[in-house]
Curated annotation (Swiss-Prot):
A motif (Cx9C motif 1) lies at residues 14-24. Keywords: Disulfide bond, Mitochondrion. It comes from the Eukaryota. This is COX assembly mitochondrial protein 2 homolog. Residues 11-55 form the CHCH domain.
């Protein structure tokens, strides 16, 4: 299962992949069940995974920054 595919939640690169997959599904109503759109799906999932990893790294960096600020504030309060 993948996340919400709303365009405002993803990068332009992923939106292109999402739109290609949706177009393939609409043009191939029955062949999509036999793997006609699998390449588009793989491309989309690869892009979504990259977005997820980028968000996760950014969140971790922000968390480390906030933790460091908290530790520095405690040290200054002790002095």
């Amino acid at each position: 299962m993948h996340p919400d595919l709303s365009s405002h939640l993803h990068t332009d690169e992923c939106n292109v992949a999402i739109n290609l997959l949706k177009k393939c599904h609409s043009e191939n109503q029955f062949l999509k069940y036999f793997g006609q759109c699998n390449d588009f799906d793989r491309e989309m999932r690869k892009c979504l995974k990259k977005e997820y990893e980028d968000r996760r790294a950014k969140s971790r960096a922000r968390s480390e920054h906030m933790k460091q600020r908290l530790l520095n504030a405690e040290k200054q309060a002790d002095n």
